[in-house]
Regions:
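Short, acidic, small-residue-rich periplasmic hinge/interaction motif at the N-terminus
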Residues: 17-57, 95, 132
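Extracytoplasmic beta-strand/coil segments of soluble accessory domains associated
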Residues: 65-109
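A beta-strand signature from Gram-negative outer-membrane beta-barrel systems
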Residues: 122-162
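Periplasmic-side early beta-strands and strand-to-turn transitions of outer-membrane beta-barrels
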Residues: 136, 152, 160, 182-265
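Face-selective signature of the C-terminal outer-membrane beta-barrel domain
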Residues: 228-245, 264-407, 412-416, 458-464, ...
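Outer-membrane beta-barrel signature, preferentially recognizing the C-terminal barrel domain
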Residues: 260-279, 392-394, 399, 403, ...
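Gram-negative outer-membrane beta-barrel transporters
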Residues: 328-331, 335, 369-376, 466-468, ...
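C-terminal beta-signal and adjacent terminal beta-strands/loops
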Residues: 468-470, 561-570, 576, 588-629
Length: 629
């Protein structure tokens, strides 16, 4: 309620002074870059939301997942612990249907198809954007059309030569050290080291139990280094990440301090990507090269149960190349793109065979713009073939999407249809004892109708949508309770509404979002779980961010509400997870070369969990000092 009161007082003031503000936004500084980004976003036909640099700096957030959770239609799965894996799900389509792109190049994981957003820092980003379906612009790669939803991470280009250093200390013995050197507008080098003990207390209470304990085996040590070079139309981005962490596991009733998970994980990730884009009159060209090398080592050694002992290393590589060309004539444009990806996976598991995959995609897009009308249609052809012992059959598929919008003054009416699929991952097909080489692709279809309003200080988006997922890939017991296998089983449908509001006035920025969705299981009309809610899909969720920027001061208050969620496929088996509300605050002040920031997350110390029996931290603090030379 207190956040609503802030909104009710600030928004009328915005309306009263909107035209004066509009004149001020021609000034180029960090405070007013929000409007610049939003203006560019209105050129896209598909629904989209953006968090800009000004909001990123003011948020009490540490990684990309912390920023995305405030966007409409987004669900974050956080597997507890300060170093727990964080994946994103958009409109209940599944995390493997969400493509994450860094400067237009996809971050991939051929092994399991998901991206851990906790590994990617916000410190080097200019903006984080979410597009339902995909962007609608020339020179997109074919891979960008292959996702049901897309997240774009835009790297921040430096504007001067500077050395930035920072140190942060927070709850649970959390230390962060950051160093960034930028040279003119040519590029930067950014490094960060993080350590946390992660031993936060928790209280888990249900109708049947009341458990109090301390999270064990939740420590994390991680180091990240990345650089980016800008040379005219050329951009070269290199990323390196290494971590050593504990995997705390789900809590055990009344025994949380006696039986501690001992799983440990070592991660090492590297990629280097080179992209070039230029225009020659009506022609446009784009080329991309990328190489990635990822290694994961997992070990668990339970003294009291040797049957679950594990010590395995996974190694995967990825090489990617793409070329796109576009041509425009008056109101018509055409774009052709083709890319090729080579991925391989090795593991020191018994009976595991080396496998590599060749994945080729080709897309043809047609754009038409006339006055306020914008039309776009794309056809995508995918060919995928694996090479290993007893390999799965090659895959050939054609999918398409169509988008349309009409703009009249400040109003835009839009709609899109998109059909796309995900290829079974290498784990789905070949994982020892569980993989199934006969799996079919998992298809999604989406229909969206919405409108947007954009005028001076205010932007509003409202969308209604329908989607369904066919042939869901799930792991089910096939030969008794001790033999599980990957199967195509499941049909779900989702009806939803997304609302987002952005308002900017002088020193105030307000961002509101809300989602309603009805996501149901429609697999087997005779089954007990037919028409039950899909696991971890809340019906209602809301978020609000208020940011204040004035001279050297910055402050933000963010609040997020998530409705109750069922966590079992059959809703009657157990009670749903409780709804939760989480509030974060952050205050900062900059004087010349020094910035001091203080933040508090989960201000009211509300216990909650995103995943069943994976409690999240309660109230926690952090103080940060930053130096600029």
């Amino acid at each position: 309620m207190w956040l609503a009161a802030v909104v009710m007082n600030v928004v009328p003031a915005m309306a009263q002074h909107a035209r004066a503000v509009h004149g001020q936004q021609l000034v180029t500084d960090s405070v007013y870059q929000l409007e610049e980004v939003v203006a560019r976003g209105t050129q896209h036909v598909s629904p989209h939301q953006t968090i800009t640099r000004a909001q990123i700096d003011a948020l009490a957030s540490n990684n990309v997942a912390d920023a995305l959770k405030y966007l409409a239609g987004v669900q974050i799965k956080d597997y507890g612990g300060l170093g727990g894996q964080k994946t994103v799900n958009v409109r209940s389509l599944g995390s493997q249907h969400v493509g994450v792109y860094l400067d237009g190049v996809r971050i991939t994981n051929a092994q399991n198809g998901t991206v851990d957003l906790g590994k990617y820092s916000l410190s080097t980003l200019e903006a984080v954007s979410l597009f339902n379906a995909n962007k609608t612009e020339p020179l997109m790669t074919a891979s960008e059309y292959a996702s049901a939803a897309t997240i774009y991470l835009k790297t921040r280009r430096p504007d001067s030569t500077a050395l930035h250093a920072g140190y942060s200390y927070g709850s649970f013995n959390t230390h962060k050290v950051n160093l960034n050197y930028s040279y003119h507008r040519l590029g930067f080098l950014d490094m960060q080291y993080t350590h946390t003990d992660g031993d936060y207390p928790f209280h888990y209470h249900t109708e049947y139990e009341d458990t109090t304990g301390t999270r064990r085996n939740s420590d994390l040590d991680q180091f990240r280094a990345e650089s980016c070079v800008f040379l005219g139309p050329l951009q070269w981005h290199t990323y390196y990440y290494i971590s050593y962490r504990g995997l705390p596991g789900g809590i055990v009733r009344r025994l949380s301090d006696l039986y501690t998970d001992v799983g440990r994980e070592w991660d090492q990730n590297f990629f280097s990507q080179l992209s070039w884009q230029d225009h020659f009159g009506s022609f446009g060209l784009r080329a991309i090269l990328k190489y990635a090398n990822d290694r994961l080592h997992y070990r668990s050694d339970y003294d009291y149960n040797m049957s679950v002992h594990s010590n395995v290393t996974y190694h995967q590589q990825d090489a990617y190349g793409a070329v796109a060309a576009s041509y425009s004539y008056k109101d018509l444009g055409v774009s052709l793109s083709s890319d090729l990806r080579w991925s391989d996976l090795t593991a020191d598991l018994k009976h595991f065979s080396y496998v590599y995959r060749l994945d080729n995609k080709t897309s043809l897009s047609v754009f038409y713009r006339w006055k306020g009308l914008a039309l776009n249609a794309t056809g995508l052809y995918t060919y995928c073939r694996d090479h290993t012992r007893r390999q799965a059959d090659p895959l050939h598929r054609f999918t398409w999407d169509a988008m349309a919008s009409y703009t009249l003054g400040d109003w835009t009416l839009r709609t899109f249809y998109k059909s796309v699929f995900r290829i079974p991952t290498l784990n789905d097909l070949y994982y020892t004892l569980v993989g199934n080489r006969s799996l079919r692709p998992e298809y999604t279809k989406q229909v969206d109708v919405g409108f947007s309003y954009s005028h001076d200080w205010l932007q509003v988006q409202l969308d209604g949508y329908y989607n369904h997922v066919k042939d869901r890939i799930v792991c089910l017991p096939l030969k008794g309770s001790f033999q599980w296998s990957m199967l195509n089983y499941g049909y779900t449908r989702c009806l939803g509404v997304d609302l987002s509001v952005n308002a900017t006035f002088k020193h105030h920025i307000i961002m509101l979002s809300g989602t309603f969705q009805d996501d149901r299981n429609r697999t087997n009309p005779g089954g007990k779980d037919y028409n039950d809610f899909v696991a971890y899909a809340p019906r209602w969720s809301f978020s609000a961010i208020y940011t204040f920027l004035w001279k050297g001061w910055s402050a933000s208050v963010s609040d997020m509400f998530v409705d109750k969620r069922y966590w079992t496929a059959q809703n009657s088996v157990d009670d749903p997870l409780d709804a939760y509300n989480c509030t974060d605050v952050k205050v900062g002040y900059t004087y010349r070369w020094l910035t001091v920031e203080a933040e508090c997350q989960n201000l009211f110390d509300k216990p909650y969990e995103m995943i069943q029996r994976w409690p999240m931290p309660g109230r926690r603090y952090a103080v940060t000092m930053k130096f600029t030379l």
